[in-house]
């Protein structure tokens, strides 16, 4: 056994490794459960009593020497790895491309933040809806064009199920579960069976706001509209209200702002009128309140809805709505600093 110990002792002096894998192999060979030291320890039991002290001391010294050698090799390898991985600060640096929010997300959040200032909170609903929440409860006549397949995407196997055409369905779901006062904001995606063009798409994003309480008037609605336009665009923005018709509001109106692309001079985006519609609005029809078990003789309310793509186009002067859904990185990178 003494000869074996002396052989290993001499071998340790000449040990060297090139990488961490070789070092681990070396450690297992000498210090592993089935390694050289373990083998010698196992044989130590059979050593004669008068030799145990001498051999035991040599065996312990060998074990210490092996551990010391492995620690030295590990430290040497660590220094080598560090020198190989040093960063050259003189090399040209290239910036990392950081992802940004989509312009639609930027504007939708901006819209929501404006209405948060007025005390509104967010409510959401499903994009796949039924006829009641999209049409019937909102006072749509059975022969209304919106119920036709030319305008709405119906589910093939059930004509009562469809992709919602507006977020007004969330208004109905909220009123069915909540009694006034109600002050709710409904952002989400909607779908319509329209040809895709620079001014229209088969899906887009909409935000609707509605308020129901005692003695709510059109004057309250108008004040909210003016506040929104100034906060969203500019404090000096020119606005106007035009009479309109929606089945779920009476009276109804549409709000226009002066075209931000041509400054009112007329262009293809505003159809050469100098004005662009940004939202529809009106006082909630009493029939809608009654459909949701809200007493229309006690309560009144207003509702307004806007297309986020339209607002985004005006705010950032984008002339083609299709750009928002094409995921062209060259287009999206322009909004890295947008707020």
From Swiss-Prot:
Mg(2+) binds at residue 250. Its EC number is 6.1.1.20. Disulfide bonds: none annotated. It catalyses: tRNA(Phe) + L-phenylalanine + ATP = L-phenylalanyl-tRNA(Phe) + AMP + diphosphate + H(+). InterPro entries: aa-tRNA-synth_II, aa-tRNA-synth_II/BPL/LPL, Phe-tRNA-synth_IIc_asu, Phe-tRNA_ligase_II_N, Phe_tRNA_ligase_alpha1_bac, Phenylalanyl-tRNA_Synthase, tRNA-bd_arm. GO terms for molecular function: ATP binding; magnesium ion binding; phenylalanine-tRNA ligase activity; tRNA binding. One of its GO terms (cellular component) is cytoplasm. It is found in: Cytoplasm. Its cofactor is Mg(2+). Belongs to the class-II aminoacyl-tRNA synthetase family. Phe-tRNA synthetase alpha subunit type 1 subfamily. Tetramer of two alpha and two beta subunits. NCBIfam families: pheS. This is Phenylalanine--tRNA ligase alpha subunit. It comes from Azobacteroides pseudotrichonymphae genomovar. CFP2. The gene is pheS.
């Amino acid at each position: 056994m003494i000869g074996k110990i002396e052989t290993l002792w001499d071998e340790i002096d000449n040990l060297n490794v090139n990488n961490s894998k070789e070092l681990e192999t070396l450690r297992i060979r000498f210090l592993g459960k089935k390694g050289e030291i373990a083998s010698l320890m196992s044989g130590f039991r059979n050593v004669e009593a008068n030799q145990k002290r001498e051999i035991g001391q040599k065996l312990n010294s060998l074990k210490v020497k092996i551990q010391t050698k492995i620690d030295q090799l590990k430290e040497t390898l660590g220094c080598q790895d560090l020198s190989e991985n040093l960063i050259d600060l003189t090399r040209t640096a290239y910036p990392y491309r950081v992802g940004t929010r989509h312009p639609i997300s930027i504007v939708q959040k901006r819209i929501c933040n404006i209405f948060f200032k007025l005390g509104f909170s967010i409510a959401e609903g499903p994009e796949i809806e039924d006829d009641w929440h999209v049409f019937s409860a909102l006072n749509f006549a059975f022969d209304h064009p919106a119920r036709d397949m030319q305008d709405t995407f119906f589910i093939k196997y059930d004509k009562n199920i469809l992709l919602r055409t507006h977020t007004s369905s969330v208004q109905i779901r909220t009123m069915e579960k909540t009694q006034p006062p109600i002050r709710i904001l409904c952002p989400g995606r909607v779908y319509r069976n329209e040809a895709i063009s620079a001014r229209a798409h088969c899906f887009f994003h909409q935000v609707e706001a509605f308020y129901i309480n005692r003695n709510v008037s059109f004057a309250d609605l108008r004040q909210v509209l003016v506040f929104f336009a100034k906060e969203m665009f500019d404090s000096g923005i020119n606005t106007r209200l035009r009479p309109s018709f929606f089945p779920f509001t009476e009276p109804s109106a549409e709000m226009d702002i002066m075209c931000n692309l041509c400054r009112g001079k007329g262009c293809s985006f505003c159809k050469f009128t100098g004005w662009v519609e940004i939202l529809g609005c009106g006082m909630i029809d009493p029939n809608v309140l009654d459909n949701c078990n809200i007493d229309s003789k006690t309560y009144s309310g207003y509702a307004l809805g806007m297309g986020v793509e339209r607002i985004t186009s005006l705010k950032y002067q984008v002339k083609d709505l299709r750009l928002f859904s094409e995921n062209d990185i060259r287009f999206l990178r322009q909004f890295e600093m947008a707020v």
